[in-house]
Each structure stands twice: as C-alpha cells, then as structure tokens.
Amino acid sequence: MDIERGIRVAVDTGKVILGSNKAIQAIKLGNGELAIMAENTPKNVKADIEAYSKLSEMPVYTFEGSSVELGSICGKPFTVSVLIIQEPGDSNILEIKE
C-alpha cells in the first residue's frame, strides 16, 4: 500500500485532525482510529503522543519523512508533525495499523 496516497485520500475524502496540540486532545478523548507522526516530531510531543495513545489504545504510525513532507502530502502550505485519522473516507490508510 502507498502510505502517501492513503494519507492524501484520507485528507481529501475523510475526516482528519492536523497538528500536535489538537492531536493530543483527540487521543486523550479517544477521537480517532490512527495517529500518524512525522519522523522529526519533537521528542516531547512524540512522548506525549505515544503515552496517550497507549492509554486510549490508538495505534501510532511513524511516517518515514519530515513534517514538511507530511504537510506537503496533506496538501497544506505548512508543516504537519502529527495527524489523526478520524474517518478514512475512501482511503485504505487504516490497513497500516494491522
């Protein structure tokens, strides 16, 4: 499966949350099916995401690229360190959590 294409389709057709602060809130509340982090996510944010995702039993995928690349894949003119897939839409992105 092409991860980049899956992310883009999920952003375009599904429901996603972009940004580390909103992502952490969503994970705490259990709002989402999959968390995706950029490889260069700051250590403190990465630690928070991993800790809260264990508590809420949400799988976390580390994207093998920078936050600049992740932002570009999402079609955004800014960096994206973390995104939460709430609804995948037409994407098969949730297959990576298996």
Swiss-Prot record:
Keywords, ordered alphabetically: Ribonucleoprotein, Ribosomal protein
Gene3D superfamilies reported in the protein's UniProt record: 3.30.1330.30
Natural source organism: Methanosphaera stadtmanae (strain ATCC 43021 / DSM 3091 / JCM 11832 / MCB-3)
One GO term of the biological process aspect: translation
Protein's recorded name: Large ribosomal subunit protein eL30
Any one of the GO CC terms: cytosolic large ribosomal subunit
HAMAP family for this protein: Ribosomal_eL30
A GO molecular-function descriptor: RNA binding
Family statement: Belongs to the eukaryotic ribosomal protein eL30 family.
NCBIfam families according to UniProt: PRK01018.1
